[in-house]
Swiss-Prot record:
Keywords: Cell outer membrane, Chaperone, Lipoprotein, Membrane, Palmitate, Protein transport, Signal, Transport. NCBIfam families: lolB (TIGR00548). This is Outer-membrane lipoprotein LolB. The gene is lolB. InterPro entries: LolA/LolB/LppX (IPR029046), OM_lipoprot_LolB (IPR004565).
Length: 214
C-alpha cells in the first residue's frame, strides 16, 4: 500500500469511528495567547490569522472531507482536521525550522511541513503557499491567468515546481474588514483540494488595538 492510500485510510478510519464522514459544525479553538482579533483594510496587513472552514480532498481513488481549523502567524502554524463530532483526525504544527504531524496515533517529524506531508501522504500539498492563496494574495512565483469583471485574480498558476498548481478563486467574502476568498480550489494532476472559509479572523498584538498598524 503506497503512502497516499495509507494516509487516507488512516483518516477514513478515524472519521468512521466517529460515525460520520462529511462536514458539519465547528467548535471554536482558543486564540493564540499573545494575539487578539483585529480589523484590517486588506488581508496582507494581517501577519497572523485564524480560520474555521472545510477541506475536501479528491483523488481518482479517494474522497476525503473534514472540518478545517488553522491558526497562522509568522512564527508558527497550527492546523487541525476534525469530524463533525469534534474528533481530531490530524494535527500539524509547524515553525520555520520544524514540523510535527500527528495522525492515527502516530507522530511524524521533519524540518519542513511541506516535505513532511509529502513524505507521509504522498501529496505535494503547497503548505508554504496556502496562507497567501487562502487570503487571496498572489505570490512571486504565481502567474495570474484569469481575472474577474472587477479585475481581481480569478485563476492563477504557481510555477515553482512543475507541473504547476492551478488555483481558482470561486467566491469572495468580507471578513475582519478585508476581502478574502470564501471558496477556492487547488488542482495539480489528479489531486484536487477544495477549501471553504466559514470564518476568517485577522489577529494582532494587543498594542495594535490601541492604534498601531498591524
Amino acid at each position: 500500500m503506497n503512502n497516499l492510500k495509507r494516509f487516507t485510510k488512516s483518516i477514513f478510519s478515524c472519521i468512521a469511528l466517529s460515525g460520520l464522514l462529511f462536514l458539519g459544525g465547528c467548535e471554536t479553538l482558543p486564540p493564540m495567547t499573545d494575539l487578539s482579533p483585529i480589523t484590517v483594510d486588506n488581508a496582507a496587513q494581517a501577519k497572523a490569522w485564524e480560520l474555521q472552514g472545510k477541506l475536501a480532498i479528491r483523488t481518482p481513488e479517494d474522497k476525503l472531507s473534514a472540518n478545517l481549523y488553522w491558526r497562522h502567524s509568522e512564527e508558527r502554524d497550527e492546523l487541525t482536521l476534525t469530524t463533525m463530532l469534534g474528533t481530531t483526525v490530524l494535527t500539524l504544527e509547524a515553525t520555520p525550522n520544524s514540523a510535527h504531524l500527528h495522525i492515527d496515533g502516530k507522530d511524524f517529524r521533519d524540518t519542513n511541513a511541506q516535505a513532511l506531508l509529502e513524505r507521509v501522504s504522498g501529496w505535494s500539498i503547497p503548505i508554504n503557499d496556502l496562507p497567501l492563496w487562502i487570503t487571496g494574495q498572489i505570490g512571486s512565483l504565481d502567474r495570474v491567468i484569469a481575472v474577474d469583471s472587477a479585475g481581481q485574480a480569478k485563476q492563477l498558476q504557481n510555477m515553482q515546481t512543475p507541473p504547476p498548481w492551478l488555483v481558482t478563486f470561486l467566491s469572495w467574502q468580507s471578513q475582519s474588514g478585508a476581502k478574502v476568498p470564501y471558496q477556492l480550489t487547488l488542482e495539480r494532476g489528479d489531486l484536487q483540494l477544495k477549501l471553504q472559509l466559514n470564518q476568517w479572523q485577522a489577529l494582532g498584538k494587543p498594542s495594535i488595538l490601541l492604534g498601531e498598524k498591524p
